[in-house]
């Protein structure tokens, strides 16, 4: 089968012929229908030092996927051939302290799909059956593939109460747009969105006409938000961009006793003035790691079932897997939404 493989620590990927994986008694074999490019895939493509420490060489990358079960292990009873599934990227053991405490996303023995073990930029992928989310039969492959990143955004939004709150989302890439949509549906009274890339600004304004979109390079974002909130600031800041300046702004515009959700991963350590921005404000700072297995995906399903947010327009480009170089060049430009690859 064809697969996108990270073959060295150098930047880039290779499209290679590899064997179709053999499954164990508790596994399923998935015929991949669609996979979207994640920010972590971009870091692996670029060989960003902070990510490469965790990458096994060689490894098939990719994890945001929808596929059809075509083979079932002898001990699997929860899935059958023909089921449409998305894999949970964090392969959890089910036996460690955190797994048994209901926090499998913190598994002490975890493997990461497309990072430490083979992923889903391929024609077929092997997954433990317990790590598959089963979709309704009528779901589109594209929607199934973005279920997991939707989960990351929803986890960032719902890490604490958002209903009746004002929210600022920092970064209007795919996760940021998902977070804006989720915040609106789950009851945010007013949403601000901050972004510097012109195409992403245009997309945010087109998708969410009622959201106040601010370009911090063109106006004083802190002043604009404080004036719009009677000098109080927002109840919730959700930082998704990973930008050091955006992170500082997220605290500056925060109301006293407000909440900051940290979703984006900075490329370097960031210095904060904790006294005025955290201690005096009694700010609550919540790190967001992926999503809560499986609670968050039920929340994603609830979000979609409302019919009030369609995430598919966030997908802006689609490529066959053979054109991966073009797709990743576009993804690294910061001028696209979600990008899909098809085997």
What name fits each language-model region?
Residues 5-22, 39-71, 86, 106-116:
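N-terminal glycine-rich cofactor-binding segment
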